[in-house]
């Protein structure tokens, strides 16, 4: 949903429809997800993306997994689900998304070196290890002066500081580890974000840096294809 057809949020009505039509059955979701090229970043996201185009922003993958996992988690009717995929992998006949021969639906890049935001989404939701993660660390060149800040934390509500000033108005997102600060105004130039959680006498922190230099909408024209090893 949101990738090959329909919209991200349509998974909810689809599951509820199956529950109503087949109440004595159970559902196993064989795969779900979206591609993410970590070199493609934007704040302008809709509820669907044309997978035949060369533009696969990481932020769209993040949005897909945030919402669709939350739907899966609150529907016990779905007894099993399989996210697609752990790692980007070779698809030699493909030529889309900015890297020929690559399926980029992984939570990590093909070389296993970069963990996408969606990786930390699942780690925060599933793992007992402490997770504190500010999203969009690769979306450095910001398009909007007024934006939102998202944090994944399975160790409690985070405090977030922008250039040393604490942000107010945090709200819960789709699950208990999902925290969002809306209507955050960036300053011109560098903007340093720091998330902090204190738990059991230990302080956890995460920091990223964004840059704002005026309103823009990069779109697909800002990116070129990258030739990388197929892995075959």
Predicted regions and their residues:
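Edge beta-strands of extracellular beta-sandwich domains
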Residues: 201-214
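Surface-exposed, short loops/turns at beta-strand junctions within beta-sandwich domains
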Residues: 183-190
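Substrate-binding/catalytic cleft of secreted carbohydrate-active enzymes
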Residues: 1-125, 129-143, 164, 174, ...
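Short hydrophobic alpha-helix segments
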Residues: 170-171, 207
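Surface beta-strand/loop "capping" patches
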Residues: 123-155, 221-232
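Beta-strand signatures of extracellular beta-sandwich domains
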Residues: 157-161
């Amino acid at each position: 949903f949101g990738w090959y057809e329909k919209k991200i949020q349509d998974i909810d009505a689809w599951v509820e429809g199956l529950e109503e039509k087949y109440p004595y059955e159970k559902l196993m979701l064989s795969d779900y997800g979206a591609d993410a090229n970590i070199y493609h970043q934007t704040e302008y996201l809709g509820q669907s993306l044309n997978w035949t185009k060369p533009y696969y922003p990481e932020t769209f993958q993040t949005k897909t997994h945030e919402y669709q996992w939350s739907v899966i988690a609150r529907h016990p009717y779905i007894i099993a689900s399989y996210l697609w995929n752990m790692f980007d992998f070779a698809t030699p006949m493909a030529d889309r998304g900015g890297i020929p021969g690559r399926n980029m639906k992984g939570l990590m890049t093909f070389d296993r070196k970069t963990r996408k935001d969606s990786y930390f989404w699942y780690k925060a939701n599933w793992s007992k290890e402490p997770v504190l993660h500010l999203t969009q660390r690769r979306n450095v060149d910001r398009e909007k002066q007024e934006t939102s800040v998202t944090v994944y934390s399975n160790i409690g509500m985070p405090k977030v500081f922008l250039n040393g000033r604490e942000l107010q108005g945090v709200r819960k997102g789709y699950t208990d580890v999902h925290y969002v600060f809306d209507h955050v105004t960036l300053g011109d130039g560098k903007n340093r974000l720091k998330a902090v959680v204190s738990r059991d006498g230990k302080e956890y922190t995460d920091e990223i840096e964004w840059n704002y230099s005026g309103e823009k909408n990069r779109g697909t024209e800002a990116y070129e294809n990258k030739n990388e090893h197929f892995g075959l």
